[in-house]
Amino acid sequence: MELRHLTYFVAVAERLNFSRAAEALHVAQPAISQQIRALEQELGISLFDRISKRVTLTEAGRALLPHARQILSAVEAARSEIRERGTLKRGTVSLGAPPTVSAHFLP
């Protein structure tokens, strides 16, 4: 299961429309369909009922949705934290103190 699969799944599940999900993610609609199909094949179950142009979540799709959201949220939180650590300034701090002060306060 790839993060892209979950991203596309959540987008379609929230919009109940493959074309709108593709538009929101700035990808072609066939790419969305292909990735959803790959996810369904991997899981061995349909996540969406497709009736004409209407799309609804199956029971399995409804069960997966909160987990997919949680996974994507956790990944974004991890990325944010790592980016923040990359922007922290690093270096050496030198302190100067008279010998009487440093003997008491500095190791």
Region roles according to the model:
Residues 1-15, 29, 33, 62, ...:
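Short alpha-helical elements of helix-turn-helix
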Residues 40-57, 62:
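A short LG(V/I)-centered, amphipathic sequence patch enriched
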Residues 65, 82:
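Conserved short C-terminal alpha-helix that flanks the catalytic cleft of nucleotide-sugar-dependent
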Residues 15, 24, 37-46, 72, ...:
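Residue cluster at the C-terminal edge of the helix-turn-helix DNA-binding motif
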